[in-house]
């Protein structure tokens, strides 16, 4: 559906996760130099967002302004091309903090690491793990308080659980990390 001015409109409320996923898509496909520009691009997609919410989303996503040697600064999420001369560690640091706050315990089976969180936190954590793009992770599946994280070969679920749990100091099923 489109509005009278040609912009897309959304008939259902957009969740924070969906909105943040769209922000990541936009930042990955083009250089966005300001929050005003990003809010206009989101509006083109049918998402009307306040500056405060957009700023909070960018912070939660670990977005940083990157200034290439020649050119205007732009928002980026994740590692930045080495020609820009800057490595963004923000998202991985944010993941460590999130794991510190949300990870209750870890377990594993085969190539799956199972992360336990407080009720209601699993989808938020899984979404962030996916956005960070750890090379050790193929993907995640989340319930209410449990996240299954699929380890990329040759890692095992135990290795991945120890890696993620070690970042947070979480305990395994028998009190071990």
Curated annotation (Swiss-Prot):
Claim: Amino-acid biosynthesis is one of the keywords in the record: yes
Record's GO cellular component terms: cytoplasm
Pathway assigned to this chain's UniProt record: Amino-acid biosynthesis; L-arginine biosynthesis [regulation]
Subcellular localization(s) per the UniProt record: Cytoplasm
UniProt KW Nucleus keyword: no
Domain of life: Bacteria
SUPFAM superfamilies for this protein: C-terminal domain of arginine repressor, Winged helix' DNA-binding domain
This protein's UniProt keywords: Amino-acid biosynthesis, Arginine biosynthesis, Cytoplasm, DNA-binding, Repressor, Transcription, Transcription regulation
Extent of the signal sequence: none
Gene Ontology molecular functions: arginine binding; DNA binding; DNA-binding transcription factor activity
Pfam assignment, any one: Arg_repressor
An individual GO BP term: protein complex oligomerization
InterPro entries in alphabetical order: Arg_repress, Arg_repress_C, Arg_repress_C_sf, Arg_repress_DNA-bd, WH-like_DNA-bd_sf, WH_DNA-bd_sf
Function: Regulates arginine biosynthesis genes.
Family note: Belongs to the ArgR family.
Listed PANTHER family: ARGININE REPRESSOR
Name of the protein in its database record: Arginine repressor
């Amino acid at each position: 559906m489109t509005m009278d001015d040609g912009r897309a409109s959304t008939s259902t409320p957009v969740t924070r996760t969906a909105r943040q996923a769209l922000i990541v898509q936009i930042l990955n496909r083009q250089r966005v130099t300001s929050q005003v520009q990003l809010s206009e691009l989101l509006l083109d997609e049918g998402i009307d967002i306040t500056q405060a919410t957009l700023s909070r989303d960018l912070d939660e996503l670990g977005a940083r302004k990157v200034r290439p040697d020649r050119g205007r600064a732009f928002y980026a999420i994740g590692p930045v091309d080495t020609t820009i001369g800057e490595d963004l560690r923000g998202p991985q640091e944010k993941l460590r903090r999130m794991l510190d706050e949300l990870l209750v315990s870890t377990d594993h089976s085969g190539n799956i690491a199972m992360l336990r969180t407080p009720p209601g936190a699993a989808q938020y954590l899984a979404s962030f793990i996916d956005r960070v793009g750890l090379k050790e992770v193929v993907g995640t599946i989340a319930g209410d308080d449990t996240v299954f994280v699929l380890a990329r070969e040759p890692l095992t679920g135990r290795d991945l659980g120890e890696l993620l749990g070690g970042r947070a100091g979480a305990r395994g099923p028998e009190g071990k990390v």
